[in-house]
């Protein structure tokens, strides 16, 4: 990014701190800020992943999606359910940043007080409020995985599949051990 002339600003320890600072910079300098997940147009674009999955595997039973703020999961779950309501969408979060699980259990957008995960791409304290109704309607289940499971999944993907996947993307791989998918067609979205 710097090579294109942009000034890179690293701020805070979790997404929520960086996002608040980005809004301040946008206001101060007149920048345009496009939220990376709490934006229905961004989430709609991410829904194209569901189209690709269903095109390649029309009989898919489960789609596992990593969750930070919920944009990717909103897009994938909403479009998947629109195209085939029988598809089960499983959201997967780090145990140390389970803001969607907390919010779904509370029935409203909830902020978790502490983040503790190696999955920094999903280290979000609060899911997107614009997205939450779609997540409530379209996510069938939430699984949380801990950092040790992510580490084992990283090693498995590297050693057995020759793929290097960052920790947020590995959430769905680690989650495979949590449910019995025998005889089912399952897609794990590797994205963070």
Describe each PLM feature range.
Residues 1-191:
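PLP-dependent amino-acid enzyme catalytic core
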């Amino acid at each position: 990014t710097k090579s294109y002339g942009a000034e890179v600003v690293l701020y805070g320890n979790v997404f929520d701190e960086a996002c608040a600072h980005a809004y301040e910079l946008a206001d101060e300098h007149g920048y345009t800020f496009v939220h990376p997940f709490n934006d229905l147009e961004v989430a709609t674009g991410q829904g194209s992943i569901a189209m690709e999955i269903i095109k390649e595997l029309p009989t898919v039973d489960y789609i596992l999606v990593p969750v930070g703020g919920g944009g990717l999961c909103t897009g994938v779950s909403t479009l998947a359910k629109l195209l085939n309501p029988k598809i089960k969408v499983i959201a997967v979060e780090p145990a140390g940043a389970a803001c969607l699980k907390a919010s779904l259990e509370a029935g409203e957008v909830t902020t978790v007080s502490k983040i503790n995960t190696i999955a920094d791409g999903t280290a979000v304290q609060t899911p997107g409020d614009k997205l939450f109704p779609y997540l409530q309607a379209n996510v069938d289940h939430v699984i949380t995985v801990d950092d040790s499971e992510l580490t084992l999944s990283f090693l498995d993907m590297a050693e057995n599949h020759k793929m290097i996947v960052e920790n947020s993307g590995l959430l769905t791989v680690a989650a495979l051990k949590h449910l019995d998918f025998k005889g089912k067609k399952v897609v794990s979205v590797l994205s963070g």
